[in-house]
């Protein structure tokens, strides 16, 4: 099961901790980042070493604070938030320069994306971040993501990049999250103090016993311990992404995982990603509004599984924002489907009975040809 899951994964989020990209906290490890870049490029290109399947890959990388400390000449990790933010600002320059350089050597384009909790809490910003990342992936670009440490405070921080990796996996509906660390994976107890500790090769990501098995804090270089990785896997499983926790120094670990080799601990999501999203839509009680559609649109939705296009819309009721859950109703007012609105209510009113090719002319921009995409829609009674 574990080998098939990673072998078949098309969209993958990879998270590497500080200890895997720095020289024991003393600045960036150029050779390590070069090696990560080589493996990332192999996955994106679809090298024969892992079956020739092209992947979409996002890298969530720590290391900015450690690099900033080196550039500033600081021997110990600062405790004051403003000093940490200063170190992150200085170090992020070096971190992204290193990835850009090493990925370019592999013939890969890269992009820097800095996120905050506010970006994912606000629905409009969430959708913008999602669409940007999906566009980058379609272009064959490797996004390198980190938290925007310079502008956040403790109340709105993700807390660690394990959590950020899980949230990014949810954001782009990844098939898998790979968390690379300085440990082999998960044990039933701390193997450093318990010789009877048993290695866990596969488990249900939602198993509450996993949190009891996980140990305490991580190293002084980074912030995450095993418990943050378990909680990240649980969060990622909510959108259908399974998680692998593995030793990042394992030779060709990403390429071998993609080839189907069982490495580390696999925490399996019990729900398929499409099922998870559609169940959330179906269970949504607070509908923000609705659109009425003609008989032709009803047939397209029910019988052919098509997306809802503006040309089939007759009327718009209520006030809703882009990304809100709305109902799709027939001429009698009966709910045919519900889904995520791709346009706000004011925009939707302008689009009624219009061809999708007119969207940009009417609105000044286009967020896609659909009012509700079929992947974001649940048909009533199905």
Swiss-Prot record:
Leader peptide range in chain numbering: none
GO molecular function: ATP binding; glutamate 5-kinase activity; RNA binding
Transmembrane intervals: none
GO CC, one annotated term: cytosol
EC id: 2.7.2.11
Gene3D superfamilies xref list: Acetylglutamate kinase-like, PUA domain
Ligand binding (ATP): 15, 181-182
Main location: cytoplasm
Binding of substrate, residues: 62, 149, 161
InterPro entries assigned to the protein according to its UniProt record, in alphabetical order: AceGlu_kinase-like_sf, Asp/Glu/Uridylate_kinase, G5K_ProB, Glu/AcGlu_kinase, Glu_5kinase, Glu_5kinase/COase_Synthase, Glutamate_5-kinase_CS, PUA
Residues in PUA domain copies: 288-366
Metabolic or biological pathway: Amino-acid biosynthesis; L-proline biosynthesis; L-glutamate 5-semialdehyde from L-glutamate: step 1/2
Pfam family name, one: PUA
Annotated keywords: Amino-acid biosynthesis, ATP-binding, Cytoplasm, Kinase, Nucleotide-binding, Proline biosynthesis, Transferase
Location in or out of the cell: Cytoplasm
A biological-process GO annotation: L-proline biosynthetic process
Family: Belongs to the glutamate 5-kinase family.
Function: Catalyzes the transfer of a phosphate group to glutamate to form L-glutamate 5-phosphate.
PANTHER family documented for this protein: GLUTAMATE 5-KINASE, ISOPENTENYL PHOSPHATE KINASE
UniProt name for this protein: Glutamate 5-kinase
Protein source organism: Delftia acidovorans (strain DSM 14801 / SPH-1)
Lineage start: Bacteria, Pseudomonadati, Pseudomonadota, Betaproteobacteria, Burkholderiales
Gene (name only): proB
């Amino acid at each position: 099961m574990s080998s098939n899951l990673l072998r078949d994964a098309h969209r993958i989020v990879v998270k590497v901790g500080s200890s895997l990209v720095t020289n024991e906290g003393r600045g960036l490890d150029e050779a390590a980042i070069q090696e990560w870049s080589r493996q990332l490029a192999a996955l994106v290109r679809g090298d024969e070493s892992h079956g020739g399947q092209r992947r979409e890959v996002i890298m969530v990388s720590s290391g900015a604070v450690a690099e900033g400390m080196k550039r500033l000449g600081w021997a110990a990790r600062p405790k004051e938030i403003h000093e940490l933010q200063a170190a992150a600002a200085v170090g992020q320059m070096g971190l992204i320069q290193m990835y850009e350089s090493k990925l370019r050597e592999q013939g890969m384009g890269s992009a820097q994306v800095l996120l905050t909790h506010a970006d994912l809490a606000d629905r409009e910003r969430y959708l913008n971040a999602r669409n940007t990342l999906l566009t980058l992936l379609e272009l064959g670009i490797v996004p390198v993501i980190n938290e925007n440490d310079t502008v956040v405070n403790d109340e709105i921080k993700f807390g660690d990049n394990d959590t950020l990796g899980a949230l990014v996996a949810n954001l782009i509906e990844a098939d898998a999250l790979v968390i690379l660390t300085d440990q082999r994976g998960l044990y039933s107890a701390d193997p450093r103090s318990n010789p009877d500790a048993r290695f866990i090769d596969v488990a249900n990501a939602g198993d509450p016993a996993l949190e009891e098995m996980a140990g305490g804090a991580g190293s002084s270089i980074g912030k995450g311990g095993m418990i943050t990785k378990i909680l990240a896997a649980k969060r990622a499983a909510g959108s259908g992404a399974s998680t692998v926790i593995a030793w990042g120094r394992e030779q060709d670990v990403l390429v071998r995982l993609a080839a189907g080799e069982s490495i580390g601990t696999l925490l399996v999501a019990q729900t398929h990603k499409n099922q998870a999203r559609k169940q959330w839509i179906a269970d949504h009680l607070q509908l923000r509004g609705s659109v009425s559609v003609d008989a032709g649109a009803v047939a397209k939705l029910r019988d052919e599984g098509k997306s809802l296009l503006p040309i089939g819309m007759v009327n718009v009721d209520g006030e809703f924002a882009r990304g809100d859950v709305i109902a799709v109703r027939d001429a009698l007012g009966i709910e045919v489907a519900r889904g995520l609105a791709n346009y706000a209510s004011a925009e939707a009113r302008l689009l009624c009975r219009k061809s999708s090719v007119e969207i940009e002319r009417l609105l000044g921009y286009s967020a896609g040809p659909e009012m509700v995409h079929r992947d974001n829609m649940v048909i009533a009674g199905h």
